[in-house]
Amino acid sequence: MTSLNPVLTIGYQLTEPMREHLGLSRSEARRRAIELLEMVGIPMAKSRIDDYPHHFSGGMRQRVMIAIALSCDPQILIADEPTTALDVTIQAQILEIIKRLREELGMAIVWITHDLGVVAGMADRVAVMYGGYIVEEAPVFELYANPKHPYTQGLLKTLPNLEGQRAERLKSINGQPPNLNQKPLSCSFAPRCSQTMERCLVENPVLENRNNNHKVACWWNP
């Protein structure tokens, strides 16, 4: 939502890509822009199309960004942290909008997020990345039920458990993330891993299929 240019109206920012890439006239692009704003739930879209970004709340600006992303009819939408900095209520609204648009428009969505709750509710297949590499990839239910990489296991253990009689201390993954300026010659997670073996310190594991289309990049295989 901070990607919007503060000195240009949302109408201009919406119509520009359509005129450039779809060859629409000014009036056609404006008409389509109003339709897109209505599609993402902007009230009184026709009268608000000439407003500036600061006239909108954070959640409404995020809806405008979704409208811009959809303006050229993509087959794949890349959603990079689409709910960051939004409160829980607005986050749920944005997720419902994207979910509805996915069904209505028949497009695929690539989610990039650190929110495991969003992943569980929105994804069909999940790729877990660490240090710039995919360390585990599986169908979403399989991944949550049977995580195989120590990093994935650690991530899931950090989620608060609301069941039970008493609250438990949240668990964390010890250590620090790797230096991404240096290409690893061994497993990037090894310094933080509880299952580290000698091979982990000298050789970088490759992503391989274990079972049920469940891929893991780890030398540890219990």
Language-model-derived ranges and their functions:
Residues 4, 12-28, 38, 42, ...:
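ABC-type ATPase nucleotide-binding domains, specifically the catalytic core motifs of the NBD
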Residues 14, 66, 90, 94:
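Hydrophobic anchor residue at the start of the ABC signature
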Residues 28-40, 155-158:
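ABC nucleotide-binding domain "signature" region
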